């Protein structure tokens, strides 16, 4: 039998190419965990320096068409308020710099996946519920839930099972969900598909989310966390546990409230076992196709700031509070 050395040579070339591809992928993955980077912001700065003449939207033409806007916001601000284009990726289907920014956010927050949101945490909360609930499904949630959750129930037709939070009558504020109250709701509604938890509430009250996650998962229910006021929980170990660390399935995080990004910017986090592609489809049902790069860049820069300096910053705040 005559051995075909040409086949062996081609196979060797194939292995060499494959090795290079694997090396490059690993290198990209390693780079994607470099929290000093801000991929969206970097891409915007690169575009701005090229001084490209815009023939597309937005109509202010990076300030040239609206001098008053430039006077109000500044040349640099309006200069990076641009439309989606190849170097800047696309929020609806990210494949480059936005994808990289989302991967960095996922690692910074200890999540499996992260989605940059430009419709506020309202859109993130609604995406959580719409991803998990269909018409007629039950969802257990606190009576003092944000109205974005109620609006999501209107959209998907899910049935709320309310848990009344305890009340501090001295301060006149509602507290978190009592574990026994949640246990009772789970027992009475074993067909519920999810439990939603405020972590924390508007007043900073945290429920026992670790125990709630354990209870819900034991009964096959997903745990969704409204962390509109909980960004700081991810970056200071002396604070109460974050939803992702507690094992919740999804969390909506208002970066603009305590994370330093621009108003209306938010992040949706998912843990292992959540279908990220399906979540992306749900997000695209309601979120704009014209994502603001000002908001995206602010999320990118703020994530970097929190990852590098968040623990120290929040420690100072805690010291001042004491």
Identify the role of each PLM range.
Residues 5-18:
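Short hydrophobic targeting helices and cationic amphipathic motifs
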Residues 16-20, 25-28:
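Acidic, Ala/Val/Gly-enriched low-complexity intrinsically disordered segments
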Residues 25-96:
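N-terminal "arm"/small-domain region of PLP-dependent enzymes with the aminotransferase-like
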Residues 37-45, 49, 69-72, 93, ...:
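Conserved PLP-enzyme active-site core in the AAT-like
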Residues 61, 120-121:
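Short glycine-rich, polar/acidic loop-and-turn segments at beta strand-coil junctions
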Residues 78-120:
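Conserved N-terminal alpha-helix of the aminotransferase class I/II PLP-enzyme fold
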């Amino acid at each position: 039998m005559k051995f075909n050395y040409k086949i062996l040579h081609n196979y060797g070339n194939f292995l060499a190419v494959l090795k290079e591809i694997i090396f490059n992928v690993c290198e990209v993955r390693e780079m994607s965990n470099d929290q000093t980077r801000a991929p969206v912001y970097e891409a915007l700065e690169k575009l701005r320096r090229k001084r490209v003449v815009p023939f597309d939207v937005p109509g202010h033409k990076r300030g040239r068409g609206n001098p008053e806007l430039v006077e109000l916001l500044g040349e640099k601000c309006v200069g990076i308020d641009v439309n989606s284009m190849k170097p800047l990726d696309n929020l609806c289907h990210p494949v480059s710099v936005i994808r990289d920014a989302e991967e960095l956010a996922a690692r910074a927050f200890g999540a499996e996946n992260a989605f940059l949101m430009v419709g506020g945490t309202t859109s993130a909360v609604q995406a959580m519920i719409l991803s998990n609930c269909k018409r007629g499904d039950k969802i257990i949630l606190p009576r003092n839930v944000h109205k974005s959750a109620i609006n999501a129930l209107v959209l998907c037709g899910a049935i709320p099972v309310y848990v009344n939070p305890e009340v501090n009558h001295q301060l006149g504020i509602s507290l978190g969900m009592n574990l026994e109250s949640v246990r009772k709701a789970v027992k009475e509604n074993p067909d519920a598909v999810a439990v939603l938890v405020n972590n924390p509430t508007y007043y900073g009250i945290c429920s026992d989310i670790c125990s709630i996650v354990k209870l819900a998962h034991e009964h096959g229910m997903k745990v969704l966390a409204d962390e509109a006021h909980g960004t700081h929980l991810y970056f200071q170990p002396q604070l109460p546990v974050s939803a992702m660390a507690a094992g919740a399935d999804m969390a909506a995080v208002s970066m603009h409230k305590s994370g330093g990004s621009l108003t209306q910017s938010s992040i949706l986090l998912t843990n292992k076992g959540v279908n990220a592609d399906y979540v992306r489809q749900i997000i695209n049902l309601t979120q704009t196709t014209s994502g603001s790069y000002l908001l995206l860049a602010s999320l990118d820069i703020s994530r970097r700031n929190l990852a590098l300096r968040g623990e120290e910053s929040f420690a100072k705040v805690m010291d001042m509070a004491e």
